[in-house]
């Protein structure tokens, strides 16, 4: 894929069910992925382990939205023990920054005091949210962000949370695999549904998020 790939091309890719990746951080090229089996997280059956629910309910974290998007994606791209490289290269980082500027990409951030210790980012189109990546430097920090994301999507009337792939880490929350054809059907319905990423009340607490998720089950 050449340098002519624009943010509008990226939006069109998501709308037809494909997404970009790179082979390595320093590789400037992109390629498109269209998995035969797609990971999705049904919002109505999201599972929260008991210990995580206690952390969400009692702290010590504060969760913010869209206050440090660039820092979140930078952390997601950083090398970590057991993962020396990343699929998030500089063109991807630039394109998602442009999506964020258009209000189509968002970050959910977990803070411990003034320190960003976890978070995730993704793309929002209609009633579909495409989770891209997450990071954590403190216990359960990215998981707390995921709980807040799910509550936000439920409150905003979203139909689809696309996780791209099913991993052992995501399976504990109820992520499942569906066929490409089933995914396309769900995506088409979700894109036709208006989703409000800011539908969750400002200042919603962890308890508020747990209640929203429980009511949707």
From Swiss-Prot:
GO terms for biological process: protein catabolic process. It catalyses: N-terminal L-lysyl-[protein] + L-leucyl-tRNA(Leu) = N-terminal L-leucyl-L-lysyl-[protein] + tRNA(Leu) + H(+); N-terminal L-arginyl-[protein] + L-leucyl-tRNA(Leu) = N-terminal L-leucyl-L-arginyl-[protein] + tRNA(Leu) + H(+); L-phenylalanyl-tRNA(Phe) + an N-terminal L-alpha-aminoacyl-[protein] = an N-terminal L-phenylalanyl-L-alpha-aminoacyl-[protein] + tRNA(Phe). The keyword ATP-binding does not apply. It holds the Pfam family Leu_Phe_trans. The keyword Transferase applies. GO terms for cellular component: cytoplasm. GO terms for molecular function: leucyl-tRNA--protein transferase activity. Gene3D superfamilies: Leucyl/phenylalanyl-tRNA-protein transferase, C-terminal domain. It is found in: Cytoplasm. Its main location: cytoplasm. Its EC number is 2.3.2.6. It comes from the Bacteria. It is an enzyme of class 2 (transferase). PANTHER family: LEUCYL/PHENYLALANYL-TRNA--PROTEIN TRANSFERASE, LEUCYL_PHENYLALANYL-TRNA--PROTEIN TRANSFERASE. Functions in the N-end rule pathway of protein degradation where it conjugates Leu, Phe and, less efficiently, Met from aminoacyl-tRNAs to the N-termini of proteins containing an N-terminal arginine or lysine. This is Leucyl/phenylalanyl-tRNA--protein transferase. It comes from Caulobacter vibrioides (strain NA1000 / CB15N) (Caulobacter crescentus). The lineage of its organism: Bacteria, Pseudomonadati, Pseudomonadota, Alphaproteobacteria, Caulobacterales.
């Amino acid at each position: 894929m050449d340098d002519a790939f624009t943010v509008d091309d990226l939006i069109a890719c998501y709308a037809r069910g494909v997404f970009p990746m790179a082979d390595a951080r320093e590789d400037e090229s992109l390629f498109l992925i269209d998995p035969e089996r797609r990971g999705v997280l049904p919002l109505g059956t999201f599972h929260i382990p008991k210990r995580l629910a206690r952390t969400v309910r009692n702290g010590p974290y504060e969760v913010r939205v869209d206050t440090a998007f660039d820092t979140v994606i930078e952390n997601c791209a950083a090398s970590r023990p057991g993962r020396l490289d990343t699929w998030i290269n500089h063109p991807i980082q630039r394109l998602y920054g442009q999506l964020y500027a258009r209000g189509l990409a968002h970050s959910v951030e977990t803070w411990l005091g003034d320190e960003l210790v976890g978070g995730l980012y993704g793309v929002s189109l209609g009633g579909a949210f495409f989770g891209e990546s997450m990071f954590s430097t403190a216990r359960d920090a990215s998981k707390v962000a995921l709980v807040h994301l799910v509550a936000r999507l439920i409150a905003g009337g979203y139909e689809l949370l696309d996780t791209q792939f099913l991993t052992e880490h995501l399976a504990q929350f109820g992520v499942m695999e569906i066929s490409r054809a089933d995914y396309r059907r769900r995506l088409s319905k979700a894109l036709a549904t208006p989703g409000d990423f800011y539908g969750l009340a400002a200042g919603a607490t962890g308890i508020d998020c747990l209640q929203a998720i429980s009511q949707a089950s």
